[in-house]
Amino acid sequence: IGFVFQTFNLLPRSTALDNVALPLVYAGLNKTKRNERAVEVLKSVDLGDRIMHKPNELSGGQRQRVAVARALVNHPSIILADEPTGNLDSKISIEIMGLFEQIHKKGNTIIIVTHEEDIALYAHRIIRLIDGKIASDEMNPHIKTYEESIKSVVDE
């Protein structure tokens, strides 16, 4: 299981590379293997040019992509994302949801917790909770895609 935090939870004095490689320490990989895999995953989230940057040198969207990369580095089949776009502007939110769309197409299950209806529309299934109880559980008949979303932003 990989986990994406709303507030990124990156180590402030560590580079993007070290933040992403951290879970691999606990997996028992040696430093060379950790760094190779971390670089590969950072490149997959379009941060190949930011590998040696610390969190304070990255934008909010870049920090969230580092957090996503960290969640992916152990090749989890399930990713839990807590308000992954909560601290981001709408354009960067669309980019993050596009990234999740790509990850899902590779076979990963992604569970997103959000209060934002427009973000929930990217899901195949939407479960709404009220006071901790399931209020509705529906399949989404029209799943929002990155392509649709980015086009609507460009058209505005």
Sequence positions of predicted segments:
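ABC family nucleotide-binding domain
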Residues: 1-122
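A generic structural signal for secondary-structure junctions
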Residues: 9, 25, 47, 128-134, ...
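Conserved catalytic segment of ABC-fold P-loop ATPases
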Residues: 122-128
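Conserved beta-strand-loop-alpha-helix hinge in the C-terminal portion
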Residues: 133-156
